[in-house]
A protein has these predicted regions:
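Short, well-ordered beta-strand elements within core beta-sheets of diverse protein domains
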Residues: 45-51, 65-72, 158, 270-273, ...
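Hydrophobic face of amphipathic alpha-helices that form TPR/SEL1-like repeat modules
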Residues: 1-41
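Rossmann-like NAD(P) dinucleotide-binding subdomain of oxidoreductase/dehydrogenase enzymes
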Residues: 134-280, 405
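Residue-level signal for inorganic ion chemistry
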Residues: 42, 78, 100, 122, ...
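Conserved C-terminal structural/oligomerization subdomain of aldehyde/semialdehyde dehydrogenase
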Residues: 43-46, 211, 234, 271, ...
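Residues at or immediately preceding the N-termini of alpha-helices
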Residues: 39, 53-56, 75, 93, ...
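Glycine-rich loop-to-alpha-helix module at the N-terminal edge of alpha/beta enzyme cores
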Residues: 45-132, 143
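ALDH superfamily catalytic-core signature
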Residues: 201-204, 244-386, 408, 413, ...
Length: 506
């Protein structure tokens, strides 16, 4: 059976420990067993024991102890450790990707792609380990030198969501590691097996380098996340999840004057102009809207089409939606797998009903498919007369709301008139329209694309958004600065003691 092969290949059992610290030490706790279910079939895959308060404290202590020595390892040497982690992930890319499909429900190529994304960020972090640059400034005082340098921040907390159980951890963990930080990881309690499998591979790499305590794991529910948020021993919390939960986490961290990186909701839109390549737009919208069953932070949820082409675009999209195969995500012919929980199915149905009450017309999909599995729902397209309240909400499901516009200013106003600000895109062959969309008066999102969809961000750019999306940045570019502390230094190599601003004292 394929499921058994996946578990055996990744050294997973029917019951697994969920707390790992120090030298790859897995510890038993008084925490409950978390049951992981296959969303495709509803059947139990395996169990993972949750951390309790005592185990959590041990994990933090492990990270604190390791930080004292890890921060002193030269950054390029830290990069060598991350390079070996990337190579380990290459070796286990397919079984890890299959486990994501099994436990979370995204299709196989997306599961493999997620592990590739973690491999890519390892490669990026290796290069970054030799590029943690500071600046040199000119002092106004003679024979003085000023510069800034970046120091490791400390043990940090990483709280990840169910939809990208490997990649988002990789964005944070690999960059933090080369920056000299140690960490505690709390994965989503919905997808604990992926975290346990990754931690076991990390342990092998750390053992090869005779290191311990840099990466620590505490599987658990919200209680563990609450402890992390309030814990002054963790100067930074990186949180990926819903906006309501993110507000609570950010508030708790801010109350203790800690740092937070928030990657929260996205109500992402694509504008399709009258000059757009419709063939290209249809392909991009389809992938962005139904990929991962609409459970990406960057999934396209709103389509804003010019009035002259909207009918043609709707006809093309509805025809494409009718051909999308739903099924077992480990079947290569499947394009859409299940939603992750029954609660997600209920929320999707409620949103469709509410959209219809607000004047929307259900054009295609939206029907539960219990004949395939308990959590399958057909991706839906709903034509809306305007951007009503339900459209302004983020429903984490494959629902695409379609609206029309006449002038680009109107389209941009509709686009920006939501509380979220993660990803956005425009399809156009007009240079002026593209530049307008990317300008100060265009998209207000952290990510803005031209002639590609809202999903599929590369690791080289900083990932994150504005407004209720949280303002945090992860992954590439200079996001690494969030994991370090900046220090400004002044050196006096003269025989005098001049003061700044020409002040004379005494």
């Amino acid at each position: 059976m394929e499921e058994n092969w996946i578990l055996k290949k990744l050294d997973l059992r029917s019951e697994n420990l969920g707390t790992c610290l120090a030298a790859g030490e897995w510890i038993e706790t008084a925490g409950p067993m978390i049951e992981s279910y296959n969303p495709t079939t509803g059947e139990l895959i395996a169990k993972v024991q949750a951390a309790d308060k005592k185990a959590y404290d041990w994990a933090v202590q492990s990270a604190q102890d390791a930080f004292k020595s890890w921060r002193m390892v030269p950054a390029p040497k830290r990069g060598e450790v991350v390079r070996d982690l990337g190579n380990m992930l290459r070796e286990y890319k397919e079984p890890l990707g299959d486990l994501i499909s099994l436990e979370m429900g995204k299709i196989q190529v997306e599961g493999w792609g997620e592990i590739q994304e973690m491999i890519d960020i390892c490669d990026f972090a290796v290069g970054l380990s030799r590029q943690l640059y500071g600046l040199t400034m000119t002092s106004e005082r003679p024979q003085h030198r000023m510069y800034e340098q970046w120091h490791p921040l400390g043990p940090i907390g990483i709280i990840t969501s169910f939809n990208f159980p490997a990649a988002v951890f990789g964005w944070n963990a690999t960059v933090a590691a080369v920056c000299g930080d140690t960490m505690i990881w709390k994965p989503s309690e919905l997808i604990p097996l992926v975290a346990v499998a990754i931690q076991k591979l990390i342990n092998r790499v750390m053992a090869d380098h005779k290191l311990s305590g840099v990466f620590n794991l505490t599987v658990g529910a919200g209680e563990i996340g609450q402890q992390m948020s309030h814990d002054k021993r963790l100067p930074l919390i990186s949180f990926t999840g819903s906006t309501p939960t993110g507000r609570k986490v950010a508030g708790a961290v801010a109350e203790r004057l800690g740092r937070s990186i928030m990657e929260l909701g996205g109500n992402n839109a694509i504008i399709v102009t009258e000059s757009a390549d419709i063939d290209m737009a249809v392909r991009a919208i389809l992938f962005s809207a139904v990929g991962t069953a609409g459970q990406r932070c960057t999934s396209t949820r709103r389509l804003i089409a010019h009035e002259s082409i909207i009918d043609n675009l709707i006809d093309r999209l509805t025809a494409a939606y009718k051909t999308v195969p739903l099924g077992n995500p480990l079947d290569p012919s499947t394009l859409v797998g299940p939603l992750v929980t029954e609660r997600a199915v209920i929320k999707m149905q409620a949103a469709i009903n509410q959209a219809q009450k607000e004047g929307g017309t259900l054009l295609v999909g939206g029907q539960p498919r219990p004949d395939i599995g308990p959590l399958f729902v057909e991706p839906a397209i709903i034509h809306m007369p305007n951007q009503s309240p339900i459209v302004r909400e983020e429903t984490f499901a494959p629902i695409l709301y379609v609206m029309s516009y006449s002038e680009l200013d109107e389209a941009i106003d509709i686009h920006n008139d939501v509380t979220q600000g993660l990803s956005s895109a425009i399809f156009t062959d007009s240079f002026r329209m593209a530049e307008r969309f990317l300008s100060h008066s265009g998209s207000d999102c952290g990510i803005a694309n031209v002639n590609i969809g809202t999903s599929g961000a590369e690791i080289g750019g900083a990932f994150g958004g504005e407004k209720d999306t949280g303002g945090g940045r992860e992954s590439g570019s200079d996001a690494w600065k969030g994991y370090m502390r900046r220090q400004t230094n002044t050196l006096n190599w003269s025989d005098e003691l001049p003061l700044a601003q020409g002040i004379e004292f005494g």
